[in-house]
C-alpha cells in the first residue's frame, strides 16, 4: 500500500476527490428530487384594523427585572446555500454550515444573551422547510428566547412562507408570531422588554424582505404603508396602556433607503459594500423618528456591520453570522445590545 501511494499519490488523490464528488452529487440529486414536492403551510395571520383597540397581551414580552438585559443579533446565516455550484453540488456548504454552527454555539455561550434576534436569510435552499426546522431546533437548544424575521431568501424553496411561519411559531423558545394580515410578508410582531411587568422598550420585528414589482422590475419590498400604519397604531397603544411613551427599536432584513446616506462616520463596524435597499421609500424612517424610535437594525448586506447615527436615529447593521454565502472575515459574528439598568442601549460587535 505504501509503495502504491508513493508511486501514484496524485492519481490516488484525484480518485478520492472524484469518488467524493460523485457521492455528493448523487446525494444532492436525491434530495433535490424530494424537494420538488411543494410544502404549503397553514399558518394564519391575524385580522387587524387600525380601528382595533390595542391591549397589552397583543405583544410578546420578556422580563428584564432589575439587571442589564442583553440582546444578541445574528443574521444572514444562509444554511445550505444553494446559490453557487460549489456550495450546492460539491458539498462545501455542509462544511461551511458545520463551521458556522461551531462558531455560533461558541458565540452564544460566551455572550450569554437574554434574547436572540435573527435578522433573516437563515436558510437558502430548495428544501427550506427541512433546514428551517433544523435551525429552529438548533436555536431552541440554547433555551433562550429568540425572535426571527424573514429575509428575501428564506422562502425561495419548496416550502412557502406560511410553512416556515408554522415552524417558527411551533418552536419552543421562539417568540415568532405570524402577525397581522395585509402586511408585506409574514412575521410582523412585537416583543416588549419589561421591568416588573411594565414595558420599558418595544422591539418591532418586521418582514420587509418580500419581493415586489416596481416599474416592471422585481425589487426588495421594504416597509409598506400598511406596516407603517400598524407600527404607529402599536406605538400609540403601548404608550396608552403603559401610561407613558415607550422607546422602541425595529429589526428587519432589508435596510431602509436612509442607510445609503451614511458614509464614513461610524461609531463601530465598517461599510464593505453599498446598501441595497427597497427602490421605493414609503417614509418609515421619518415615522420611526417621530414615534420614539431609537435604533433601526438590518441585515441583507453581508459586508456591512456599521453602527452610525443619522438624523437622530441609530442606523445599525446586524453582523453576518456564518461562513456560508458572500462574507468577509472582518464582518463575521454578531451584534450585542445591552440595555442597562437605566434603559440606555449600548452596542458591541462580537467577532467570530
Residue ranges: model-predicted function:
Residues 1-24:
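N-terminal Sec-pathway targeting helices
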Residues 32-134:
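N-terminal active-site segment of His-dependent metallophosphoesterases
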Residues 39-63, 133-243, 335-338:
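Extended active-site neighborhood of metal-dependent phosphoesterases/phosphodiesterases
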Residues 76, 104, 116, 121, ...:
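Divalent metal-coordination and catalytic microenvironments
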Residues 111-114, 202-205, 217-305:
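His/acidic metal-ligating clusters that form di-metal
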Amino acid at each position: 500500500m505504501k509503495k502504491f501511494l508513493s508511486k501514484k499519490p496524485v492519481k490516488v488523490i484525484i480518485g478520492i476527490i472524484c469518488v467524493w464528488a460523485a457521492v455528493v452529487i448523487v446525494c444532492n440529486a436525491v434530495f433535490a428530487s424530494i424537494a420538488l414536492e411543494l410544502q404549503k403551510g397553514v399558518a394564519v395571520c391575524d385580522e387587524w384594523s387600525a380601528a382595533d383597540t390595542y391591549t397589552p397581551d397583543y405583544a410578546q414580552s420578556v422580563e428584564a427585572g432589575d439587571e442589564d438585559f442583553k440582546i444578541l443579533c445574528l443574521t444572514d446565516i444562509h444554511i445550505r446555500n444553494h446559490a453557487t455550484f460549489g456550495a450546492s453540488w460539491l458539498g462545501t456548504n455542509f462544511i461551511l454550515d458545520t463551521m458556522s454552527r461551531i462558531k455560533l454555539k461558541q458565540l452564544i455561550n460566551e455572550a450569554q444573551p437574554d434574547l436572540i434576534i435573527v435578522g433573516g436569510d437563515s436558510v437558502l435552499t430548495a428544501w427550506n422547510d427541512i433546514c428551517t426546522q433544523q435551525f429552529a431546533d438548533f436555536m431552541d437548544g440554547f433555551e433562550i428566547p429568540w425572535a426571527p424575521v424573514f429575509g428575501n431568501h428564506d422562502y425561495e424553496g419548496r416550502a412557502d412562507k406560511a410553512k416556515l411561519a408554522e415552524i417558527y411559531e411551533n418552536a419552543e423558545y421562539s417568540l415568532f408570531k405570524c402577525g397581522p394580515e395585509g402586511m408585506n410578508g409574514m412575521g410582523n410582531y412585537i416583543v416588549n422588554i419589561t421591568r416588573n411587568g411594565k414595558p420599558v422598550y418595544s422591539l418591532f420585528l418586521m418582514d420587509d424582505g418580500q419581493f415586489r414589482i416596481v416599474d416592471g422590475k422585481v425589487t426588495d419590498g421594504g416597509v409598506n404603508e400598511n406596516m407603517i400604519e400598524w407600527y404607529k397604531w402599536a406605538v400609540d397603544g403601548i404608550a396608552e396602556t403603559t401610561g407613558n411613551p415607550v422607546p422602541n427599536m425595529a429589526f428587519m432584513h432589508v435596510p431602509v433607503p436612509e442607510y445609503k446616506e451614511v458614509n464614513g462616520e461610524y461609531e463601530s463596524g465598517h461599510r464593505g459594500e453599498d446598501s441595497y435597499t427597497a427602490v421605493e421609500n414609503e417614509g418609515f424612517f421619518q415615522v420611526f423618528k417621530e414615534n420614539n424610535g431609537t435604533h433601526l437594525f438590518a441585515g441583507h448586506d453581508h459586508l456591512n456591520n456599521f453602527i452610525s447615527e443619522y438624523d437622530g436615529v441609530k442606523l445599525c447593521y446586524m453582523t453576518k453570522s456564518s461562513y456560508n454565502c458572500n462574507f468577509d472575515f472582518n464582518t463575521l459574528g454578531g451584534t450585542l445590545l445591552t440595555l442597562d439598568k437605566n434603559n440606555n442601549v449600548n452596542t458591541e460587535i462580537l467577532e467570530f
